[in-house]
């Protein structure tokens, strides 16, 4: 089904999937946090140009390092979330009936990726809500603790799961489509490399395999992110201003009425850029860590 499945046959322990996923999530979250913060600001109905937004954040919110605001909850979400996601995905692949039909195998990748992400997304929803509000300038949170206390005081436990429905509508399709296109791209790129480099097997050559992983990550990341961007924008609105955006349908109607179709594209470029690179880093580091056996 995939290289991940092959490593399982070679005896890769589940703990290695946890550690490799955490490593990939940590690297992607720390390096790309500025893009995540800017994407959140774009989606909270701000009409400033990107250069103007960056300049205002740097000049009025604490300098260049203010672009990394919200890094801690991002790290907590990405490291533990990616770790659990890869563990659960590997578990599903290990126990699910294996299909010899290529089309059925791709469909398995689609539903397994979506199901694993939805389950992990629910478990880490509180961290996601805290991260989004901490990145926004709509709230005057100075610490992570102050954001937790304020949400609990004003909204109770439900506040930490605000926007889960629209988040699931974003994450499950995105993850499913990502795994689907990732494995499909790897399969086709391996064939392409083999066709033009018959003397060197891509499957067994580390540099070629890494190139294939990176290219597959970029292709699948950009495709899945572009398709699911409207759900991400609605998720951000619901989590930032729940008193205005009540739920998925209400938010969609409100955005369309006030901003038209263009409103659903808020943060599109930044999200496609960040998610494409982020997913590529996470998956490439994950597979690299497993193959290089850097995780003992």
From Swiss-Prot:
The keyword ATP-binding does not apply. It comes from the Eukaryota. Solcar repeats lie at residues 12-95, 104-188, 208-292. Coiled coil: none annotated. The chain crosses the membrane at residues 18-43, 70-96, 110-135, 163-186, 212-238, 267-285. Mitochondrial glycine transporter that imports glycine into the mitochondrial matrix. Plays an important role in providing glycine for the first enzymatic step in heme biosynthesis, the condensation of glycine with succinyl-CoA to produce 5-aminolevulinate (ALA) in the mitochondrial matrix. This is Mitochondrial glycine transporter. It comes from Schizosaccharomyces pombe (strain 972 / ATCC 24843). The lineage of its organism: Eukaryota, Fungi, Dikarya, Ascomycota, Taphrinomycotina.
């Amino acid at each position: 089904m995939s290289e991940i499945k092959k490593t399982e046959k070679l005896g890769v322990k589940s703990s290695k999937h946890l550690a490799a996923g955490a490593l990939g999530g940590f690297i992607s979250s720390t390096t790309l946090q500025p893009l995540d913060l800017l994407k959140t600001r774009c989606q909270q109905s701000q009409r400033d140009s990107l250069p103007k937004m960056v300049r205002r954040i740097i000049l009025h919110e604490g300098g260049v390092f203010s672009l990394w605001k919200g890094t801690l909850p991002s790290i907590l979400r990405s490291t533990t979330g990616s770790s659990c996601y890869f563990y659960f995905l590997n578990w599903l692949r290990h126990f699910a009936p294996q299909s010899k039909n290529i089309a059925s195998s791709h469909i398995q990748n689609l539903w397994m990726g979506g199901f694993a992400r939805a389950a992990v997304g629910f478990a880490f929803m509180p961290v996601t809500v805290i991260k989004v509000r901490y990145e926004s300038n709509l709230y005057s949170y100075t610490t992570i603790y102050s954001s937790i206390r304020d949400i609990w005081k004003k909204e109770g436990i439900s506040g930490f799961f605000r926007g889960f429905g629209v988040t699931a509508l974003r994450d499950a399709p995105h993850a499913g489509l990502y795994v689907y296109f990732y494995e499909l791209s790897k399969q086709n790129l391996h064939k392409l490399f083999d066709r033009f480099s018959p003397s060197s097997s891509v499957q067994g050559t580390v540099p070629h395999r890494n190139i294939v992983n990176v290219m597959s990550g970029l292709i699948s990341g950009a495709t899945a992110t572009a398709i699911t961007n409207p759900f991400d924008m609605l998720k951000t609105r619901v989590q930032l201003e729940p008193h205005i955006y009540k739920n998925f349908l209400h938010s969609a109607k409100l955005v369309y009425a006030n901003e038209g179709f263009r409103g659903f594209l808020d943060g599109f470029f930044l999200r496609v850029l960040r998610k494409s690179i982020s997913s590529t880093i996470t998956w490439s580091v994950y597979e690299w860590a497993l193959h290089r056996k850097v995780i003992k």
